[in-house]
């Protein structure tokens, strides 16, 4: 894909990353300080989804494209697990 052209997945993942950033900021300000390392992990894995989807748009090969999206999927799974930890 070319710069300036975004897929629906790219747009949604960027919006999700923005919500993750806002949520983690709120948790750092108002949440239990003992969970700060978990908040930071949510931030890392949650924003990595969008970063990898963005990288996939400029993949050097079909295999590279698939690899980037697979990494994004794994980061999404990790983020969900950390969010479940915080929910409990």
Predicted regions and their residues:
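Amphipathic alpha-helical assembly/interaction segments
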Residues: 1-88
């Amino acid at each position: 894909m070319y710069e300036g052209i975004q897929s629906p997945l790219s747009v949604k993942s960027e919006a999700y990353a923005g919500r993750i950033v806002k949520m983690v900021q709120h948790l750092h300000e108002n949440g239990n300080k003992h969970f700060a390392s978990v908040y930071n992990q949510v931030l890392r894995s949650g924003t990595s989804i969008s970063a990898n989807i963005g990288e996939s748009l400029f993949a050097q090969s079909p295999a590279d494209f698939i690899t980037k999206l697979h990494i994004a999927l794994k980061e999404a799974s990790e983020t969900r697990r950390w969010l479940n930890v915080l929910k409990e």
